[in-house]
């Protein structure tokens, strides 16, 4: 069934789940911008539903396919049936796992066109000849391909996955009305249990190894004697390392300086309590947390991974470094936190950049053209 002047274009997202995370947040933000404005947005979760399903514009249009461990032919059949039932005009998969199911359910994109998105750098297990060939072959079945930053697009190209120049960069956007500079930073700190003069370094994300929380915990231990007001604010929950990381926080020699806020739906109240956001992950495509912090005029110390490097100017709007170990991270934190005036100046410039280049309106326009182009092709 094709979209017409009288019927919106129907898009079905295929995800592992809608559990809280950066990828999922991007899907929700895009869906909320497009649904009811020329588009009808649905979602199918392979394994389970997830809390972010309730943030979708119509939670009733989120289904679970009941994928078992390993490859699940039953999930393919259920996805194929759901595609027919919804009358979807195109299917939007996210990262390799969901693309496998999208390709199988649509007979290689022949019954319904596939739009596919990549959201993070390839990991060692993705770089084997077999995995690279698998991605290359599956990419050929897609009507449109996109990556969430130009740096990620170039990263995929460097690994031979974009020989035809087909991958488009579709940067994430941030709601700059929701995420804004704190009217009262001291009050924001107090609400989370900090003192007004505490130096608060935050980290936001699921409790998984790829976010590299442990590196930040080690850096705190190294800096504890030098910076008596240094505190950590850890925002996020869930993930494969949740229990281990919670135990590590509780057993940390400086446990009294760590506030674990868990999963929060009011992140706009968390960033203003921070003097600096740490983003030591090495795999970010374009981190939602980085953009949200910048919109709140909070400067970011980030690993020079592909997406971060195009968002942060290391001399004006934040701090970029090769954060390969705790000693390096501690050195960068020491330098950044040692000049509060410079932190404020870089935070203000960070917000200006977000307003200029990473608006929700710009993101919406990217996806409108991506979807319309896929149907026209």
Predicted regions and their residues:
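A conserved mid-protein helix/loop that constitutes part of the nucleotide-sugar donor-binding site
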Residues: 21-29, 199, 203-222, 240-244, ...
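Short His-centered aromatic/hydrophobic patch
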Residues: 93-99, 118
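Short hydrophobic beta-strand element within catalytic cores of glycosyltransferases
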Residues: 45, 299-302, 312
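Conserved acidic donor-binding segment of nucleotide-sugar-dependent glycosyltransferases
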Residues: 313-315, 319-326, 335-341
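A short, well-ordered alpha-helix in the C-terminal region of glycosyltransferases
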Residues: 190, 328, 335, 342-357, ...
